[in-house]
Curated annotation (Swiss-Prot):
Alphabetic keyword roster: Lyase, Metal-binding
Short motif (DDxx(x)D/E motif): ranges: 80-85
Broad enzyme group: lyase
Reported function: Terpene synthase that converts its substrate farnesyl diphosphate (FPP) into the sesquiterpene protoillud-7-ene.
Protein name as it appears in the record: Terpene synthase 18
Gene: TPS18
Reaction equations catalysed: (2E,6E)-farnesyl diphosphate = (2S,3R,6S,9S)-(-)-protoillud-7-ene + diphosphate
Homology family: Belongs to the terpene synthase family.
Molecular function via GO: metal ion binding; terpene synthase activity
Organism: Heterostelium pallidum
GO biological process: terpene biosynthetic process
Length: 324
């Protein structure tokens, strides 16, 4: 039996999830948008599973900001699951991607209009912040088809996989949305600091690897293991499951250690802070990067999306629950 607790993170990255009342609010928005069918239990469960992730990524924000995070997760689900399911042919998939690019750049459709409008209002004169958020969403949209096509050539090398997946996992829009949530006591040049950009990459890759671990059984059962490192390490390296897991744990720890070194240099480069508000907002952003990792693991241990009585991870198959 494998344990996700073999993956170690700094103790100050631990979190207590935010309150869940926003989930119902975003669900009613989803009904209004036509994302969900009224009185459909399966739709309601799917919504709760996906949107509940927000309270782990943003454990310390207010209701308005939780709603924004929930709307982002709802949009991710609406767009990504359809393409991943393979229900569209190539041309239809390309057309859908182009349509979603326009939705986020110009905001003509309700599916993204509310979130886009909230962000624009919260940013005020910070159009650079708003543009970074929209650009990260468009970048994520553009990554989905290329990543899905990688499997046509078989399992990739882990370096190629990580390079593509760090965009495809969707961490960057979460980070830029968190920048939108700030009250703006920071200079915009911070976000082009090479340390900050590399920190984002490392966090995105760790989130990816955690997601690959918790989704392993589901993806193998869906014949999608070719793009899961826990699966393809076994075949590329002729290893068993425990050895492949240890390889992934070591890889995660390597990225975390590199991140910690970068974060230390990033903070040194900003010292001294101009005031307490600047210090607070920098650490708000850093905490969000931490929570993307620890929140992903914590959420995955309790969501029916991945939990299973036959999961290889002991934390994901509690005997007292039944799963769909």
């Amino acid at each position: 039996m494998l344990s996700l607790n073999e993956i170690k993170f700094p103790s100050h990255w631990n979190l207590v999830p935010n309150e869940p009342s926003y989930v119902d609010y975003v669900y009613r928005e989803g009904l209004d948008l036509g994302v969900w069918r009224p009185d459909n239990q399966r739709d309601r469960m799917a919504h709760n599973n996906v949107v509940s992730l927000t309270r782990f990524f943003w454990p310390n924000v207010d209701f308005e900001r939780l709603v924004m995070g929930g709307e982002l997760m709802l949009w991710f689900f609406t767009f990504d699951d359809g393409l991943d399911a393979g229900i569209y042919d190539d041309q239809k998939s390309v057309d859908l991607v182009r349509r979603m690019e326009i939705v986020f750049m110009d905001g003509p459709e309700k599916v993204a209009f509310r979130l886009r409008s909230r962000c624009l209002e919260m940013c005020g004169k910070r159009r650079d912040t708003f543009n970074r958020f929209i650009s990260s969403c468009v970048q994520w949209v553009d990554s989905i088809i290329p990543f899905n096509k990688v499997k046509d050539g078989g399992s990739p090398h882990i370096e190629l996989y990580s390079f593509l997946r760090k965009i495809n996992i969707g961490a960057y829009p979460c980070v830029t949305l968190t920048e939108v949530m700030l009250n703006h006591h920071l200079e915009p040049y911070i976000w082009s600091d090479p340390r900050w950009l590399k920190m984002n990459e490392n966090i995105a890759i760790v989130v990816t690897l955690i997601n690959d671990l918790v989704s392993y059984e589901k993806e193998v059962n869906d014949n999608a293991g070719v793009l899961n490192p826990l699966y393809f390490f076994q075949h590329q390296n002729n290893q068993n499951l425990p050895d492949s897991y240890r390889k992934m744990v070591n890889l995660i720890h390597q990225y975390v250690n590199d991140y910690l070194h970068l974060e230390e240099g990033f903070l040194r480069s900003m010292a001294p802070f101009h005031d307490a508000l600047q210090h607070q907002e920098v650490h708000f952003m850093l905490d969000h990067l931490h929570y993307l990792i620890t929140g992903s693991r914590m959420w995955s241990m309790q969501t029916p999306r991945y939990c299973s009585p036959t999961s290889p991870f002991i934390e994901m198959r509690p005997p007292s629950k039944s799963y769909l």
